[in-house]
Amino acid sequence: MQIASSPFTHNQRSTRRIMLLVILACIPGIIAQTYFFGYGSLIQVMLAMITALLAEGAVLQLRKQPVMARLQDNSALLTALLLGISLPPLAPWWMIVLGTLFAIVIAKQLYGGLGQNPFNPAMVGYVVLLISFPVQMTSWLPPLPLQGTSVGFYDSLLTIFTGYTHSGENIHQLQVGYDGISQATPLDTFKTSLRSQPADQILQQPIFGGVLAGLGWQWVNTGFLVGGLLLLWRKAIHWHIPVSFLLALGGCAAVSWMIAPQSFASPMLHLFSGATMLGAFFIATDPVSASTTPRGRLIFGALIGILVWLIRVYGGYPDSVAFAVLLANITVPLIDHYTQPRVYGHKSGHK
């Protein structure tokens, strides 16, 4: 009789498979983003992925780690994907290269690689770019229905690498919509316009012509929501973080909107604009930098939702998912310390 050695149960969900599933779940949101904002997002993702693989491979070589085995876990590709779709589609090529290098080399490998980083690498790269180059990082094109000039793949490629389309237009000219007015994202438009207009007048602007929220952005968020639900269905992520994130953000927005509807954005605008769904299902749920206990995940997600609302309303940036996630990452050791489940046979309590 042959006796097998342990382990006697096996989990087929390897890191490589989970990372690949998360990448595939991003596809609905990427399709929507490409349709409404052009091919630039796809180009940014490809540049980020190439940079991430080269950077991670070089660092692993320097650390004398097995290069191919580490690269095949798909974690570098996922970091690159999240950063690539977070940047404006026509941002200069050197920005995505710089941000990806910072995310992989500094925010991930400097801490020891996958499983050791205390902060979400993609969001570290994003915040570094946002603080360093705020103008370029807020230069989003108008959504397709409002575009004054259609930007195809070739023009997107030219603009990313040279700054101009084949007809000589730069990013600032491309931002001008069909009505001759320079466009911004719904959250940015709402936040800026509140200084001089009440909310009901702001919502008459064409950018807010969507069924749920801003034109284009509502479908991008819906796409990432669909992908996030797929991850929940496949049990690739826990439900605690996205649910508590969205409930906290929606709750804060609902209370403020009911108290002063002329001064605050509606819950739907908060939930279906910016990077809300991407953040809730794909960024905040990073298993390395997020809380690891069930109660801790609820607290962690709710904290991010509250921070997103606070920074959007009172901070200097119209969208704030990256800042909120990184700030919440700082609290993870404390949250995990006080939310560890009691071990059977031991009394609860902390010394």
Swiss-Prot record:
EC number: 7.-.-.-
Leader sequence residues: none
Residue stretches spanning the membrane: 18-38, 40-60, 87-107, 121-141, 211-231, 241-261, 264-284, 298-318, 321-341
Subcellular location, principal: membrane
Cofactor(s) named in the record: FMN
Compartment(s) of residence: Cell inner membrane
A Pfam family recorded for this sequence: NQR2_RnfD_RnfE
Modified-residue entries (FMN phosphoryl threonine), positions: 185
Repeat listed as a keyword: no
This protein's UniProt keywords: Cell inner membrane, Cell membrane, Electron transport, Flavoprotein, FMN, Membrane, Phosphoprotein, Translocase, Transmembrane, Transmembrane helix, Transport
Protein topology in the membrane: Multi-pass membrane protein
Quaternary assembly: The complex is composed of six subunits: RnfA, RnfB, RnfC, RnfD, RnfE and RnfG.
Family membership noted in the UniProt record: Belongs to the NqrB/RnfD family.
Name this protein carries in UniProt: Ion-translocating oxidoreductase complex subunit D
Native source species: Yersinia pestis
Protein encoded by which gene: rnfD
